[in-house]
Design a protein with these regions (language model features):
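Extended, solvent-exposed, turn-rich assembly/linker loops in the middle of proteins
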Residues: 12-89
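Long, contiguous amphipathic alpha-helices that act as assembly "spine/axial" helices in icosahedral shell
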Residues: 1-21, 49-61, 161-183
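Sequence/fold signature of self-assembling virion shell proteins
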Residues: 28-34, 71-200
Length: 200
């Protein structure tokens, strides 16, 4: 319950930071019902200008922004339900015009910058993560399906028998799991991030 939000926050903020650095991001747009569709289509067109029409795109969108689309009678007509496969898991998501899957993510995980607490430094003993004071709100991130490469590695698992485990008379396991996201330099220009606040 704690790990997945932290991984999401790290990955989305990493993509956003790369887009901002590469100038494939726009800022200063506060989502509103009368302009959101036009803005979204324009950003999709910006990506398609580079990758072409046949490259599948995924739109990772803030849940509060997605709600504007879903709650509007006019805008919701543009949304269809489609199957989205991620690894071996297939699930149903809303998509724009039946083409571009909309992956809705909690707003607290859609910021441009976080402090990831190491659990050791003074003031960081509780671990976890928090948005920094200078972080901005991400409206959406548009990426080709294969541009960001999410990777994870599991370190050697240790198993403790009940005689060794001092916390309970039961077996215990521990392991380290490492996560990262890679975006090859030539692929950054194929991604686009839309941010609520102005970009400096």
């Amino acid at each position: 319950t704690k790990v997945i939000p932290e991984i999401d926050a790290y990955r989305y903020s990493t993509i956003a930071a790369a887009c901002i650095k590469a100038k494939t991001a726009s800022g200063g747009y506060v989502p509103a019902e009368d302009t959101i569709l036009q803005k979204l289509y324009y950003d999709i067109a910006t990506v398609q200008e580079i990758v072409g029409d046949n490259t599948p795109l995924v739109i990772t969108i803030s849940r509060m922004v997605a709600a504007i689309l879903s709650m509007s009678d006019k805008l919701s007509k543009k949304l269809d339900v489609t199957d989205f496969k991620q690894g071996d898991v297939s699930f149903k998501v809303k998509s724009l015009d039946g083409q571009h899957p909309l992956i809705s993510v909690g707003s607290e995980r859609m910021k441009t910058e976080y402090l990831f607490k190491d659990g050791k430094t003074s003031g960081q003993e509780d671990g976890g993560f928090a948005a920094t004071a200078s972080s901005k709100n991400i409206n959406w991130i548009i990426t080709p399906r294969k541009a960001p490469v999410a990777v994870s590695k599991t370190d050697k698992m240790r198993i403790f028998d009940p005689e060794t485990n001092q916390k309970a008379r039961a077996y215990a396991m521990d392991y380290r799991k490492y996560h990262d996201i890679w975006i090859p330099d030539q692929q950054i220009k194929t991604c686009f991030t839309n941010v609520k606040e102005e970009l400096s």
